[in-house]
């Protein structure tokens, strides 16, 4: 869980920027977007297979160059 300690005389904008960066590193926003709507297990499997296929093609293209 991201958290930011604010020092004396530290502007709020800077603390907010630090907090947003920590949230991004932790992957909270992407997780929230992923869980925003229910996704059927069959759709999850399909997306996972497509992603694996894309990774394999990308790896194959990289090996050819």
From Swiss-Prot:
Q: Provide a GO CC annotation, any one.
A: ribonucleoprotein complex
Q: Which GO terms describe its molecular function?
A: structural constituent of ribosome
Keyword annotations for this protein? Ribonucleoprotein, Ribosomal protein
Mind listing the GO biological process terms from this record? translation
Q: Which NCBIfam families does the UniProt record give? A: S21p
Family of this protein: Belongs to the bacterial ribosomal protein bS21 family.
The record's section on PANTHER family has:
MITOCHONDRIAL 28S RIBOSOMAL PROTEIN S21, SMALL RIBOSOMAL SUBUNIT PROTEIN BS21
Q: What is this protein called?
A: Small ribosomal subunit protein bS21
- Origin species: Trichlorobacter lovleyi (strain ATCC BAA-1151 / DSM 17278 / SZ) (Geobacter lovleyi)
